[in-house]
From Swiss-Prot:
Family: Belongs to the phosphoglycerate kinase family.
Gene name of this polypeptide: pgk
Protein name as annotated: Phosphoglycerate kinase
Domain of life (superkingdom): Bacteria
Entries under InterPro entries matching the protein: Phosphoglycerate_kinase, Phosphoglycerate_kinase_CS, Phosphoglycerate_kinase_N, Phosphoglycerate_kinase_sf
Residues annotated as binding substrate: D21, L22, N23, R36, H59, L60, G61, R62, R113, R146
Main location: cytoplasm
Localisation: Cytoplasm
PROSITE patterns linked: PGLYCERATE_KINASE
Protein's pathway: Carbohydrate degradation; glycolysis; pyruvate from D-glyceraldehyde 3-phosphate: step 2/5
Source organism (scientific name): Aliivibrio fischeri (strain MJ11) (Vibrio fischeri)
GO BP terms in the entry: gluconeogenesis; glycolytic process
């Protein structure tokens, strides 16, 4: 995909409007998890060091659109940036009719969702955003799947629209994993339900050499092979769909599993062959043989795409499957991309962050990209690059 990159532009003296993802958790006026701000800092610093007049904005939470609500203000983010950048960062509440900035100055524009017309991508608001800048920088991959005024409309109307370093890196990594992957490509899809990941599974079944399934999703595939899954979470109405997918793609299904009689973190894990699962059993993880077999498949992969844990890894007795998969990915010489909230939690828990080639910042956007859907913000950047 061809987009203009911010790093290729002359920024000195230019009014630069950065749409970042600063949607961070806040408690008692303090940022409680700074991962998204840290990810955005290099882009902001590049613009400041280049002598640009820098505006950065984001959504935060779900306020009633068009109404100011202090609970969802970006003020805590401004306080964080003041400390992180060691400079005077201002918060602008009323900015739609214009702002005066100096070169090397940073202003945070208040929560875009306080502006009426943001979610519906209204033209009037989009043009007001665009009038603020010479260059629009889209750097929020996590919102790239939404066509809103601050992610799409502004870019269609700004003099120049480009991808920020964070977004450009994301598109490059996902493109490398999906558009032209080194093979074999192994995709790992975990989660509780086939129905919520069906489009992802169908899309990946067409491009993956091996499609590994885990979590509740795997139970539906175990049932599709004719085995009893007891009281496990599975979807009987999607057994035929699972059988169809297994004909289209190599999907290694678990041969042994970790079971218990109740969903309880203190429940003892009982390892069973899939043919031995009883009516009152609940499957919560892969067994050691299945984990070892999948680890070998991952070890031979040249490209790995990972979305979702393969068991109830939050419970110590049922973390072995996800721990084993994590270790295999960490030790793999292949190119690995991981994304999705639970996946990131697993990466943190098993300490493999430094060993994954690329960790996606987008939840819904990551899944939609993997599904093969067009992301509106990316389509906008491609269109503007042609012009």
């Amino acid at each position: 995909m061809s987009v203009i990159k911010m790093t290729d532009l002359e920024l000195a003296g230019k009014r630069v409007f950065i749409r970042a993802d600063l949607n961070v958790p806040v408690k008692d006026g303090k940022v409680t998890s700074d991962a998204r701000i840290l990810a955005s800092l290099p882009t902001i610093k590049l613009c400041l060091e280049a002598g640009a007049k820098v505006m950065v904005t984001s959504h935060l939470g779900r306020p009633t659109e068009g109404e100011y609500n202090e609970e969802f203000s970006l003020a805590p983010v401004v306080n964080y940036l003041n400390d992180a950048l060691d400079c005077d960062v201002k918060l602008a509440k009323d900015y739609l009719d214009g702002l005066e900035l100096n070169a090397g100055e940073l202003v945070v524009l208040e929560n875009v969702r306080f502006n009426k017309g943001e979610k519906k991508n209204e033209e009037e608001l989009s043009k007001k955003y665009a009038a603020l800048c010479d260059i629009f920088v889209m750097d929020a991959f996590g919102t790239a799947h939404r066509a809103q005024a601050s992610t799409h409309g502004v870019g269609m109307n700004a003099p120049v629209a480009c991808a920020g370093p964070l977004l450009a890196a994301e598109l490059e990594a996902l493109g490398k994993a999906m558009d032209n992957p080194e093979r074999p490509l192994v995709a790992i899809v975990g989660g509780s339900k086939v129905s919520t990941k069906l489009t992802v599974l169908e899309s990946l079944s067409k491009i993956a050499d091996q499609l590994v399934v885990g979590g509740g999703i795997a139970n539906t595939f175990i049932a599709a092979e004719g085995h009893n899954v007891g009281k496990s979470l599975y979807e009987a109405d999607l057994v035929e769909t699972a059988q169809k997918l297994m004909k289209e793609c190599a999907i290694p299904v678990a041969t042994d599993v970790a079971c218990a009689k109740a969903f309880d973190e203190n429940a003892e894990a009982e390892i069973k062959h899939v043919s031995e699962v009883q009516d009152d059993d609940m499957i919560f993880d892969l067994g050691p043989d299945s984990t070892a077999a999948l680890a070998e498949i991952i070890g031979n992969a040249k490209t790995i795409l990972w979305n979702g844990p393969v068991g109830v890894f939050e419970f110590k007795n049922f973390e072995a499957g996800t721990a084993g998969i994590s270790k295999a990915i960490a030790e793999s010489a292949g190119f690995s991309v991981a994304g999705g909230g639970d996946t990131l939690a697993a990466i943190d828990k098993f300490g493999i962050k430094a060993d994954v080639s690329y960790i996606s910042t987008g939840g819904g956007a990551f899944l939609e990209f993997v599904e093969g859907k067009v992301l509106p913000a990316v389509a906008m950047l491609e269109e503007r690059a042609k012009a």
